[in-house]
Design a protein with these regions (language model features):
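Iron-associated oxidoreductase/ferritin-like identity signal
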Residues: 1-166
Length: 166
C-alpha cells in the first residue's frame, strides 16, 4: 500500500477511536438528563465508531500495511443541553466526512482501487450520519423540551447492527 495512503488511513482509524470516546462522553452527559433513549442512541454511536476502527484495522491487515494505534485528546464532557450535544455531533460528523473525502482523494491519486472501493462505504455512511444528526436537531428544535419524552422513546428503539468486516 502506498505510504501516503497508509498514513491517512492510520490517522483516520485513530480518529474513529477518538470519535468513539467523544460519543461515550456525550452518552455519559446525557445519562445525567434522564433521557434513557438518547443515552442508548449515543451508546450505539460509540459502538459504531469502534466498529469503524476495527474495519479499518482489518483492511490494513488484509493489505499487509502497518497499523499504528495512537493516543487522542480528552473528549469534551460538559454540555448545555441535548440540542448542543447534537449540534456538536453534527459538526464532528462533518469533520469526519471531510477526512473520508481526503482519503478518497489520496486513493484516487495513487490509483488504489481496493481502497476506493473500501472507502465508498464510508462516503455513503457519512451521508447517513449527517442526515441523522440534522434530522435529530430539527426534531429537538420543533418539539422543544415538552416533546423530548416522545423523541427519547424513539431514540430508545435504535439497536446496534454489527458492521460487516468487508
Amino acid at each position: 500500500m502506498n505510504q501516503k495512503l497508509a498514513d491517512a488511513i492510520n490517522t483516520q482509524l485513530n480518529y474513529e477511536i477518538e470519535s468513539a470516546h467523544v460519543y461515550l462522553a456525550m452518552q455519559a452527559y446525557i445519562s445525567t438528563l434522564g433521557l434513557e433513549g438518547f443515552e442508548n442512541w449515543f451508546g450505539i454511536q460509540y459502538e459504531e465508531e469502534l466498529a469503524h476502527a476495527r474495519k479499518f484495522i482489518k483492511f490494513m491487515n488484509d493489505r499487509a500495511a502497518r497499523v499504528e494505534i495512537r493516543g487522542f485528546e480528552t473528549p469534551r464532557n460538559e454540555f448545555k443541553s441535548l440540542l448542543e450535544v447534537c449540534e456538536v455531533s453534527l459538526a464532528h460528523e462533518k469533520g469526519v466526512t471531510e477526512r473520508i473525502n481526503n482519503i478518497m482523494s489520496i486513493a484516487h491519486e495513487v490509483k488504489d482501487y481496493a481502497a476506493i472501493s473500501f472507502f465508498q462505504w464510508y462516503v455513503e455512511e457519512q451521508v447517513e450520519e449527517e442526515d441523522n444528526f440534522g434530522k435529530m436537531i430539527d426534531k429537538i428544535k420543533l418539539v422543544k423540551d415538552a416533546g423530548l419524552y416522545l423523541l427519547d422513546k424513539d431514540a430508545a428503539a435504535r439497536v446496534f447492527v454489527p458492521i460487516p468486516a468487508k
